[in-house]
Protein backbone atom coordinates (compact mmCIF):
# COMPACT_ATOMS: atom_id res chain seq x y z
CA UNK A 1 0.00 0.00 0.00
CA UNK A 2 1.52 3.30 -1.04
CA UNK A 3 1.43 6.55 0.92
CA UNK A 4 -1.42 7.99 -1.16
CA UNK A 5 -3.64 4.97 -0.42
CA UNK A 6 -2.87 5.22 3.31
CA UNK A 7 -3.91 8.88 3.40
CA UNK A 8 -7.01 8.04 1.33
CA UNK A 9 -8.04 5.52 4.02
CA UNK A 10 -7.82 8.32 6.62
CA UNK A 11 -9.78 10.70 4.37
CA UNK A 12 -12.53 8.11 3.71
CA UNK A 13 -12.87 7.62 7.47
CA UNK A 14 -13.22 11.39 8.04
CA UNK A 15 -10.05 11.15 10.13
CA UNK A 16 -8.03 13.92 8.48
CA UNK A 17 -9.15 16.93 10.53
CA UNK A 18 -8.27 20.58 9.99
CA UNK A 19 -8.36 23.34 12.61
CA UNK A 20 -6.19 24.06 15.67
CA UNK A 21 -5.19 21.01 17.66
CA UNK A 22 -3.02 20.44 20.70
CA UNK A 23 -1.28 17.12 20.10
CA UNK A 24 -0.39 14.56 22.77
CA UNK A 25 3.17 15.87 22.50
CA UNK A 26 2.01 19.35 23.57
CA UNK A 27 2.75 20.77 20.12
CA UNK A 28 0.04 22.62 18.17
CA UNK A 29 -0.94 21.69 14.61
CA UNK A 30 -3.44 22.72 11.92
CA UNK A 31 -3.97 19.02 11.09
CA UNK A 32 -5.02 16.13 13.33
CA UNK A 33 -5.13 12.49 12.32
CA UNK A 34 -8.05 11.06 14.33
CA UNK A 35 -7.06 7.43 14.08
CA UNK A 36 -9.98 6.34 16.27
CA UNK A 37 -12.23 7.01 13.26
CA UNK A 38 -10.00 4.72 11.19
CA UNK A 39 -9.79 2.00 13.85
CA UNK A 40 -13.57 1.80 14.36
CA UNK A 41 -13.74 0.07 10.96
CA UNK A 42 -12.20 -3.41 11.25
CA UNK A 43 -11.84 -3.85 7.48
CA UNK A 44 -10.02 -0.53 7.04
CA UNK A 45 -7.81 -1.25 10.05
CA UNK A 46 -7.09 -4.71 8.69
CA UNK A 47 -6.02 -3.37 5.30
CA UNK A 48 -3.64 -0.85 6.89
CA UNK A 49 -2.15 -3.29 9.39
CA UNK A 50 -1.75 -6.05 6.81
CA UNK A 51 0.22 -3.58 4.68
CA UNK A 52 2.30 -2.59 7.72
CA UNK A 53 2.99 -6.26 8.53
CA UNK A 54 4.15 -6.84 4.94
CA UNK A 55 6.45 -3.82 5.09
CA UNK A 56 7.91 -4.97 8.43
CA UNK A 57 8.59 -8.43 6.95
CA UNK A 58 10.39 -6.81 3.99
CA UNK A 59 12.55 -4.51 6.11
CA UNK A 60 13.40 -6.58 9.21
CA UNK A 61 15.93 -9.36 8.81
CA UNK A 62 15.52 -12.39 11.02
CA UNK A 63 12.67 -13.65 13.18
CA UNK A 64 10.23 -11.47 15.08
CA UNK A 65 8.96 -12.89 18.36
CA UNK A 66 6.38 -10.28 19.36
CA UNK A 67 4.80 -6.92 18.66
CA UNK A 68 4.70 -4.48 21.60
CA UNK A 69 2.76 -1.22 21.50
CA UNK A 70 2.18 1.75 23.78
CA UNK A 71 -1.32 2.06 25.28
CA UNK A 72 -3.75 3.49 24.37
CA UNK A 73 -3.31 4.49 20.74
CA UNK A 74 -0.96 1.71 19.72
CA UNK A 75 -2.98 -1.23 21.02
CA UNK A 76 -5.29 -1.71 18.01
CA UNK A 77 -2.67 -1.36 15.26
CA UNK A 78 -0.23 -3.42 17.31
CA UNK A 79 -2.75 -6.23 17.75
CA UNK A 80 -3.82 -6.23 14.11
CA UNK A 81 -0.23 -6.13 12.84
CA UNK A 82 0.69 -9.01 15.17
CA UNK A 83 -2.31 -10.98 13.88
CA UNK A 84 -1.03 -10.72 10.30
CA UNK A 85 2.51 -11.57 11.41
CA UNK A 86 1.26 -14.51 13.50
CA UNK A 87 3.14 -13.39 16.63
CA UNK A 88 1.90 -12.37 20.11
CA UNK A 89 0.69 -8.81 20.67
CA UNK A 90 1.53 -7.09 23.95
CA UNK A 91 1.39 -3.54 25.21
CA UNK A 92 2.97 -1.27 27.76
CA UNK A 93 0.88 1.13 29.81
CA UNK A 94 1.56 4.05 32.06
CA UNK A 95 2.05 3.47 35.76
CA UNK A 96 2.96 6.58 37.74
CA UNK A 97 3.75 8.36 34.47
CA UNK A 98 6.10 5.74 33.00
CA UNK A 99 5.47 2.92 30.55
CA UNK A 100 5.71 -0.54 32.08
CA UNK A 101 4.90 -4.04 30.91
CA UNK A 102 2.12 -5.46 33.10
CA UNK A 103 -0.64 -8.07 32.99
CA UNK A 104 1.76 -11.01 32.92
CA UNK A 105 2.88 -10.45 29.33
CA UNK A 106 5.73 -12.94 28.73
CA UNK A 107 8.34 -10.62 27.21
CA UNK A 108 11.75 -12.02 28.11
CA UNK A 109 15.46 -11.54 27.53
CA UNK A 110 16.57 -12.20 23.99
CA UNK A 111 13.15 -11.90 22.35
CA UNK A 112 13.19 -9.93 19.08
CA UNK A 113 10.44 -7.33 19.18
CA UNK A 114 8.95 -4.76 16.82
CA UNK A 115 7.38 -1.77 18.56
CA UNK A 116 4.21 -0.73 16.68
CA UNK A 117 2.59 2.71 17.06
CA UNK A 118 -0.33 4.42 15.41
CA UNK A 119 0.98 7.91 14.55
CA UNK A 120 4.48 9.26 15.28
CA UNK A 121 4.93 13.02 15.75
CA UNK A 122 7.96 13.62 17.99
CA UNK A 123 8.73 9.97 18.75
CA UNK A 124 8.40 10.46 22.53
CA UNK A 125 5.86 7.67 23.13
CA UNK A 126 7.85 5.35 20.88
CA UNK A 127 11.09 6.07 22.75
CA UNK A 128 9.38 5.54 26.11
CA UNK A 129 7.86 2.27 24.90
CA UNK A 130 11.20 1.07 23.54
CA UNK A 131 12.86 1.93 26.87
CA UNK A 132 10.25 -0.13 28.76
CA UNK A 133 10.78 -3.07 26.39
CA UNK A 134 14.55 -2.82 26.90
CA UNK A 135 14.13 -3.18 30.66
CA UNK A 136 12.84 -6.74 30.08
CA UNK A 137 15.99 -7.74 28.20
CA UNK A 138 14.10 -8.07 24.91
CA UNK A 139 15.67 -6.50 21.82
CA UNK A 140 13.73 -3.97 19.75
CA UNK A 141 14.74 -4.74 16.15
CA UNK A 142 12.57 -1.97 14.63
CA UNK A 143 9.75 0.44 15.29
CA UNK A 144 6.78 0.80 12.94
CA UNK A 145 3.79 3.08 12.56
CA UNK A 146 0.96 3.76 10.18
CA UNK A 147 1.92 7.41 9.68
CA UNK A 148 5.10 9.28 10.54
CA UNK A 149 3.80 12.85 10.57
CA UNK A 150 7.28 14.24 11.31
CA UNK A 151 8.38 13.71 7.73
CA UNK A 152 11.19 11.45 8.93
CA UNK A 153 12.52 13.85 11.58
CA UNK A 154 11.31 11.93 14.66
CA UNK A 155 14.03 9.96 16.41
CA UNK A 156 12.77 6.83 18.14
CA UNK A 157 16.09 5.15 18.90
CA UNK A 158 15.86 2.49 16.19
CA UNK A 159 14.83 2.12 12.56
CA UNK A 160 11.31 3.54 12.00
CA UNK A 161 9.19 1.81 9.36
CA UNK A 162 6.05 3.68 8.28
CA UNK A 163 3.32 3.24 5.68
CA UNK A 164 3.25 7.00 5.12
CA UNK A 165 5.84 9.64 5.93
CA UNK A 166 4.50 13.17 5.66
CA UNK A 167 5.59 16.49 7.10
CA UNK A 168 2.60 17.96 8.91
CA UNK A 169 3.51 21.21 10.65
CA UNK A 170 3.60 21.20 14.44
CA UNK A 171 4.49 24.23 16.55
CA UNK A 172 5.58 24.95 20.11
CA UNK A 173 2.84 26.87 21.99
CA UNK A 174 4.92 30.06 21.95
CA UNK A 175 5.70 29.84 18.20
CA UNK A 176 2.21 29.64 16.69
CA UNK A 177 1.55 31.30 13.33
CA UNK A 178 -1.07 34.08 13.65
CA UNK A 179 -3.69 32.23 11.61
CA UNK A 180 -3.42 29.15 13.86
CA UNK A 181 -3.40 31.18 17.09
CA UNK A 182 -6.64 32.86 15.96
CA UNK A 183 -8.50 29.52 16.02
CA UNK A 184 -9.81 27.90 19.23
CA UNK A 185 -7.61 24.94 20.20
CA UNK A 186 -8.96 21.40 20.62
CA UNK A 187 -7.14 18.61 22.48
CA UNK A 188 -8.32 15.32 20.95
CA UNK A 189 -5.29 13.15 21.93
CA UNK A 190 -5.10 10.47 24.62
CA UNK A 191 -2.08 11.42 26.74
CA UNK A 192 -2.87 12.63 30.28
CA UNK A 193 -6.53 11.64 30.16
CA UNK A 194 -7.80 11.31 33.71
Swiss-Prot record:
Coiled-coil boundaries = none
EC number(s) per UniProt?
2.4.2.10
Cofactor dependence is on: Mg(2+)
This protein's pathway: Pyrimidine metabolism; UMP biosynthesis via de novo pathway; UMP from orotate: step 1/2
GO MF terms here are: magnesium ion binding; orotate phosphoribosyltransferase activity
Q: Does the keyword Metal-binding apply?
A: no
Enzyme class, first EC level, given as a word: transferase
- GO process terms (BP): 'de novo' UMP biosynthetic process; pyrimidine nucleobase biosynthetic process
Biological function: Catalyzes the transfer of a ribosyl phosphate group from 5-phosphoribose 1-diphosphate to orotate, leading to the formation of orotidine monophosphate (OMP).
Concerning its family, UniProt says: Belongs to the purine/pyrimidine phosphoribosyltransferase family. PyrE subfamily.
Q: State the oligomer form and interacting partners.
A: Homodimer.
Task: Tell me what this protein is called.
Answer: Orotate phosphoribosyltransferase
Species = Parvibaculum lavamentivorans (strain DS-1 / DSM 13023 / NCIMB 13966)
Amino acid sequence: MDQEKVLKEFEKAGALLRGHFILSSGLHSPVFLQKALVFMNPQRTGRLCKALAEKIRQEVKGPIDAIVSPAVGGIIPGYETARYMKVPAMYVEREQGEFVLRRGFPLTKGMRVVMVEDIVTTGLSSRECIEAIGKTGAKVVAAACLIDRSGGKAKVGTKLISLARIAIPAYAPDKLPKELAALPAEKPGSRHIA
